Amino acid sequence: MANDALSAIFSNPSRKGVQPSTSIVSYTNNEDDIIDVENGKFNKNKNINTNVYVDNSSIEESEVVPLPETKSIWSKIYYDFIVLDKTTLNVSLKESFLYNRDLKPVEEERRCWSWFNYLYFWLADCFNINTWQIAGTGLQLGLNWWQCWLTVWIGYTFAGIFVVLNSRFGSAYHLSFPITVRASFGIFFSMWPIINRVVMAIVWYAVQAWLGATPVALMLKSIFGKNLEDRIPNHFGSPNSTTFEFMCFFIFWVVSIPFVLVAPHKIRHLFTVKAALIPFAAFGFLIWALKKSHGKIELGTLNDYSPHGSEFSWIFVRSLMACVANFAALIINAPDFGRFAKNPQASLWPQLVAIPLFFAITCLIGIIVTAAGYHLYGVNYWSPLDVLGQFLETTYTRGTRAGVFLISFVFALAQLGTNISANSLACGADMTALFPRYINIRRGSLFCVAMALCICPWNLMASSSKFTSALGAYAIFLSSIAGVICADYFVVRRGYVKLTHLFLAQKGSFYMFGNKFGANWRAFVAYICGIAPNLPGFIGDVGAPKITVSEGAMRLYYLGYPVGFFISAVIYLILCYFFPVPGTPVTNFLTEKGWFQRWAYVEDFEQDWKNELRRDDLCDDTVSIYDGTEEKIVY
């Protein structure tokens, strides 16, 4: 009965959506006939005693029996202000979780990203303060400029490969992350990776907002005087921040809220402005720094010592892994923007080339500015914006104040755009997947913004070492998820997915994995195994008191992302070999050959899904593959 209700609710959404003011109405048919809603017509069918749900814009008002009016004020508040999607009122939370319009495959009309769109996307994303600080981290550890830049090239090349791998599922089947993860973790256990990503998006939002406080501080000093921080009494209770710094953070946080409230399809104008202004500000900053240093920069290490031997090797690895860890959330997010690709190649080579190229250019600017600042002031600033602050401290003229203000304004805008696109929108989309009845993207984004105040990002960002620790934390949890997803899709399933089963929880659904909990225990075990080796090193890195961690554990932790990724992938493959999963096109993935991914046609998906939804179980379903001429049944 619930399946019939859910099927009827989502009838014909592409033609005429349910009006928010009228929503869904229901009535019970206890007579001999039942009205069957099909394209706005009413035909009489066999006798069924059930509720029928229709869009009341399709029928005459006189034929509608409205839902009972609620007398309680709390009920009125609940239905009018808390419930968002009225189409889910007459189905359970479980059924609204399975399918809603935010999660369905992207139809051809909305798949409009060509190769150049992906280039623009990464061009806009690479210019932010966080990327500049990644380069500064290598210099802080003792590398010289070219060694640091080499780690950037290698690190972001690996990051690009991971992004492309993780986006293939979304690109081929036009699905977002909350759905793609169901294939490997299970229909309902997929909530755990989604919650992981929500938490990481909130933490990242807080960190990026704290970074946004730096250009805000420079703008205020440009207007009100370079000693503004000294004139504001410090009553902040943490040694890692001051009242002035928190005030700047709060200003950035408040200014962000109106932009978070803008609809996602309208906020694109902010990204357009960002992509146009940021390169001018970045290269202008670079030229200004080189001019002030008379073209002289420190080409050697910026520390008093140069590491050698194994010490150098592990510092090199740490700098390299910081680049990969910086992409941990974006690797998981890859299907969210991969699903809009016009064709299979649109999201492949552009991302593989653009990510290392654009981020290497940005990091090179950060490295040179930091090296020029060291030549000028004899201080190893790990954030290039600290160099900009020194410009203001040493030369407080009209020209310097104007230049610092403009560059700081553009970088604040860059942080705002990056925070919205990479964090608040991602959090909002994931929370929409978890609670479609109560949360839309706007509410989810506001929740992300509110929680950012509780993260205390000033403690995470107190030094470059704490910064790399924060990156490592993101990496060890998200890398295991990515490893399981890639192993399942590329090796176990060989690119084959039965789309309708990803949205069905009946008995026999491939992705319920034979249990009522919709959980793939193999994925859970592999996920834990991927995290476990990195935990001792993580504890040692964050400086837990009275705990001594061996050097070997720390070095394993320095390799955090690939360790988590490959261990979870290997464990998952071993478990799937001895305990095969349903819905695979091959019986032995180690010996049998074949690749079964196809560019999915989803224009009629909703009708196909409704047909499957009406079935009591899916136990007799088979795996069918397309060989280019016809559909063949595997079993």
Curated annotation (Swiss-Prot):
Biological role: Transport of allantoin.
Membrane topology (Cytoplasmic): 1-144, 196-198, 265-269, 333-351, 423-443, 488-522, 582-635
All ranges on the Extracellular side of the membrane: 166-174, 220-243, 291-311, 373-401, 465-466, 544-560
Subcellular location: Membrane
Name by which UniProt lists this protein: Allantoin permease
Keywords of this entry: Membrane, Purine metabolism, Transmembrane, Transmembrane helix, Transport
Transmembrane feature ranges: 145-165, 175-195, 199-219, 244-264, 270-290, 312-332, 352-372, 402-422, 444-464, 467-487, 523-543, 561-581
Taxonomic lineage of the native organism: Eukaryota, Fungi, Dikarya, Ascomycota, Saccharomycotina
Molecular function per GO: allantoin:proton symporter activity; nucleobase transmembrane transporter activity
Gene that produces this protein: DAL4
Main location class: membrane
Signal peptide per UniProt: none
Organism the protein comes from: Saccharomyces cerevisiae (strain ATCC 204508 / S288c)
Membrane topology, record value: Multi-pass membrane protein
PANTHER family to which the protein is assigned, alphabetical: ALLANTOIN PERMEASE-RELATED, NCS1 FAMILY PURINE/PYRIMIDINE TRANSPORTER
Similarity remark: Belongs to the purine-cytosine permease (2.A.39) family.
GO cellular component: fungal-type vacuole; plasma membrane
Disulfide bonds: none
Keyword set includes Cytoplasm: no
Gene Ontology biological process terms in this record: allantoin catabolic process; allantoin transport; nucleobase transport; purine nucleobase metabolic process
Domain of life, source organism: Eukaryota
